[in-house]
């Protein structure tokens, strides 16, 4: 009788877990860009050693372009990055990903970091505003 009860409880538990897993898989995946249009955090910029390497979207990285790496925004998204220390801002295209253990929210090209004025410090606090998939009109 104890074995029967144990088997029944085990079977019931597995059935409940299976139903729960199926329900979770039908929920649409939440995208970072649709939930939060503004993020705050720490920014850095690419080392020169990455020049000429492929980015996550297949483009060749150039420190002279206004591009950036971000872990949750869709590739091809344009964002406005504002340096919170000096209020300078720049629009960049997300074309790469950060290392998954990186605590920064964005890694910018050298050109973008120069426009934001943090080459000497190497890091700065920023505001990142999602603009969308189309480049902003100038």
Label every PLM stretch briefly.
Residues 2-6, 10, 18-138:
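Secreted/periplasmic proteins
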């Amino acid at each position: 009788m104890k074995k029967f009860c144990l088997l029944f409880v085990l079977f019931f538990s597995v059935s409940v877990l299976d139903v729960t897993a199926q329900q979770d898989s039908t929920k649409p995946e939440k995208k970072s860009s649709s939930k939060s249009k503004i993020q705050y955090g720490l920014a850095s910029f690419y080392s020169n050693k990455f020049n000429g390497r492929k980015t996550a979207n297949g483009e060749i990285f150039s420190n002279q372009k206004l591009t950036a790496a971000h872990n949750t925004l869709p590739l091809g998204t344009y964002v406005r990055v504002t340096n919170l220390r000096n209020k300078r801002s720049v629009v960049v295209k997300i074309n790469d990903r950060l290392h998954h253990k990186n605590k920064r929210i964005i890694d910018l090209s050298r050109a973008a970091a120069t426009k934001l004025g943090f080459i000497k410090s190497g890091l700065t606090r920023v505001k990142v505003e999602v603009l969308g998939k189309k480049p902003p009109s100038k």
